[in-house]
Amino acid sequence: MNTDFLPIIPVVLPLALAPFCLLIKNSMFCWLLTVVAMLVSCVTSFFTLGQLSTQNELTYPFGGWEAPVGIEYSIDHLNGVLLFFISSIGLLLTLLYSASLRWDLKGSRHYFFYTAFLLTFAGLAGVIATADAFNAFVFIEISSLGTYILVALGKDKGALLASRSEEHTSELQVT
């Protein structure tokens, strides 16, 4: 079985499923998509750790272009453990938090939560898996976007203001 693509699954799958949650707008279906994304990410990162027992590093060059020219994902022992850790935490959060989500958010906004959660997770996984600084910055921005949305979804009227304040602070820090 060809498993060269394993390093990209925890990044690409949540990133690909996030727009579906936004388009479908069904809370239960979005929850199911999120559980599937987190479960597959957790399983693939576990198998990646298994492959790392025989290798020092797993790499995946996008489009066949090597690292200095193209985009390359690289998983070594440390970021393999980190990827498995955040995938496991993401799966646990998805399974456990869904019960209390109805008290924290209006039902009509649940799909926003799952979209933002998937974006945040994909950004974190991308920062861990990427092998170049440019894509690390891109994934930090994706994760930040998801985090701003999660903060803005709060019931409190100050949530939107807090999200905007966090965004401005982050922009100043990046600059």
Language-model regions, residue ranges each:
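Transmembrane helix-loop-helix hairpins at membrane boundaries of multipass inner-membrane proteins
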Residues: 1-6, 20-115
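The first (N-terminal) embedded transmembrane alpha-helix
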Residues: 5-17
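Juxtamembrane interface elements at the cytosolic ends of transmembrane helices
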Residues: 16, 20, 96-100, 142-151
